[in-house]
Amino acid sequence: MSNKEEHVDETSASGVKEVSSIAARHDNGYAPSLITSTSGMDSFQSHALLNDPTLIEDYSDIINNRPTSGSKLTLGNEDSESMGGSVVVTPTSNKSSPFNSKLNILSNAAEKGHDVLRNRDDDKELEEENVEKHMHSNSKRDQRHYKENSSELPDSYDYSDSEFEDNLERRLQEIETDSVDSADKDEVHFSVNNTMNPDVDDFSDGLKYAISEDEDEEENYSDDDDFDRKFQDSGFQGEKDDLEEENDDYQPLSPPRELDPDKLYALYAFNGHDSSHCQLGQDEPCILLNDQDAYWWLVKRITDGKIGFAPAEILETFPERLARLNCWKNENMSSQSVASSDSKDDSISSGNKNQSDAESIIPTPALNGYGKGNKSVSFNDVVGYADRFIDDAIEDTSLDSNDDGGEGNGQSYDDDVDNDKETKVTHRDEYTEAKLNFGKFQDDDTSDVVSDVSFSTSLNTPLNVKKVRRQDNKNESEPKTSSSKDREDDYNANRYVGQEKSEPVDSDYDTDLKKVFEAPRMPFANGMAKSDSQNSLSTIGEFSPSSSEWTNESPSTPIVEESSSIPSSRAIKDISQYIHAKSKIEETTNVENTEGQIQASLGSSGGMANQTDAEQPKEELEKHHSTPEEEKQSTLSLHSSSEEDFYMDEQRAVSSASINSSLSGSRALSNTNMSDPASKPNSLVQHLYAPVFDRMDVLMKQLDEIIRK
């Protein structure tokens, strides 16, 4: 301990040489044994190495700035304060890596030892072996000494011998210089170094790794890139294969080949693992049994009749299947049209360039452009159509004509002969016009919509409306009434539906009539109770006076005296559509008058009635309607002359006396009110209702006679 204090006091005065000699007399003797007995070098070389200013550093600045006696450093072992020339003191921490200190040693010693290493003798290898042996023995003592110092001091220091550092530096420099000179020598020295002690090998390997760390990083960059590229290529290849397999699974489905409303079809194959599942193949049909659950439907497989559950999302219903078929057809047709247009454009462009060559090489197809023209729609009863007949040879031109049986108004033949080196194609077009006959219904505008209230639509006659009316030529020669020409056409259009079936009908006149508005006949209307409502089933489609509630054929309703008029709109429409011509009405009235006279001759009480019946019906109706017209003027405003003329007496009498009294009163009132134009009845109404009232009078007279008897 006294030697160390003397060394510290005399360091600044005696120099580096005296410090090294004092350190050589240290009790432990680590450095002297390393220098004198183990180095194997002569004294000259050892003194040259120790006194070389490039290898020995001056620690005067450290000695001057050493800590005071009261600092924490002096509290521990005083050996830590000794600064020998051959000892390098480096403070370390528990977290410091040994490679960092070794890198610092290499960086300082690499530049200073080039000249010394180049002047060495040939016995360098032997010396290195001796040094390695002593290093192995001394390393154990260093470790033991380090443990003792670390136990005594709280802050331990790393001690490294200068001779050991020099030997290590020489070895590393030899490796570097030999690697620069030739790679072979580098391999030899590296193999010799591998024969060293395992501890030294580990240490040298760590230093070697620290030196070549930067170079390895640069090389690793390229190696890592190559490895990553290979890994990515292999990984992406696998992912690519997986994606291709998934794309194969979700390829667009083929168009449906079977359509059945009662079946379901599997869009994709279903392989259920549960026993309750029904396994289905792609496009396999099945029958739906229960669809109450939104996710699993109970189905029955058609192939073997197995019943089980299948996911509803893979089952395709009939509307969905039909929609998919339509989509496929639309896409297919659009793609074909685009391809055909492109090919047509290409052929046209090529034909414009080499027209002569194209005509000789490319044959014109026989049906080129057939069916691509504009399609027309005809709304009349004459249909024109064309048939194209293709012959294999020019001689075979005789083909059957139209098999439809229609009237051929005109036929035109268009023969096109396509000359080719091998084949000759001939075709001809036959145009035909035919008139369509659909029985008594000559209009094809019937609606296919079926009403919800109809129960048996097959037996009902469809409602047929003619949009164009043809004017009758026979009625033009007959005398016209005071009404307009349009109203006269309406007279000739229909017959009065209230007449009996036994009434004689003129055949010539019947052929000239044309049905304009015909209501369907219900097959179950005979057994149905009549209803007063206009919206009931019994009155749907009946546009005739028989549907009116104010005639004898309507159901009996309580007679109300307050109602002095009938519904105007419906009555006017119904009556205006079923009015007779003047000639027919006069003919029927004459027949009824003769029948009334024959029946009236049976009783004496009906004599006066027979005289009134013999009079003209025009005068009778004027007298009969004069009184109601005066009552109507007091209660209602004058809407129109036709509406006032349709007034009917609601209080129908039950005896002939009441009828005769009303007729007699009407005669008296008609004479006073003939000058009033509003009270004058219309001639059309007289012709319409005169036969009805006459027959009613005759019937009432017969009833009176029966009662009297």
Swiss-Prot record:
SMART domains documented for this protein: SH3
Biological processes per GO annotation: cellular bud site selection; cytoskeleton organization; establishment or maintenance of actin cytoskeleton polarity; mitotic spindle pole body organization; negative regulation of actin filament polymerization; negative regulation of exit from mitosis; positive regulation of transcription by RNA polymerase II; protein localization
Short name of one Pfam family: SH3_1
Residue numbers of Phosphothreonine PTMs: T177
Region of interest (Disordered), residue spans: 61-258, 334-367, 396-421, 464-510, 525-571, 600-680
An example Gene Ontology molecular-function term: protein phosphatase regulator activity
GO CC, one annotated term: cytoplasm
SH3 domain: residues covered: 259-320
Composition bias type Basic and acidic residues, residue spans: 111-123, 131-150, 470-504, 615-633
InterPro entries from the UniProt entry: Polarity_Bud-Selection_Reg (IPR053039), SH3-like_dom_sf (IPR036028), SH3_domain (IPR001452)
Lineage top rank: taxon: Eukaryota
Compositionally biased tracts (Acidic residues): 212-226, 396-406
Residues that bear Phosphotyrosine: Y159
Modification type N-acetylserine: residues: S2
Biased composition (Polar residues): 62-74, 89-107, 531-552, 600-614
Keywords of the record: Acetylation, Cell cycle, Cell division, Phosphoprotein, SH3 domain
Positions of modified residues (Phosphoserine): S160, S162, S212, S222, S376, S378, S401, S507, S655, S658, S670
Low complexity compositional bias, start-end: 553-569, 655-671
Subunit structure and binding partners: Interacts with GLC7.
Other comments on record: Present with 538 molecules/cell in log phase SD medium.
Biological role: Important for bud site selection. Seems to be a regulatory subunit of the BUD14-GLC7 type-I phosphatase complex. The BUD14-GLC7 complex is necessary to regulate microtubule dynamics at the cortex and may function as a specific activator of the dynein complex.
Protein name per its UniProtKB record: Bud site selection protein 14
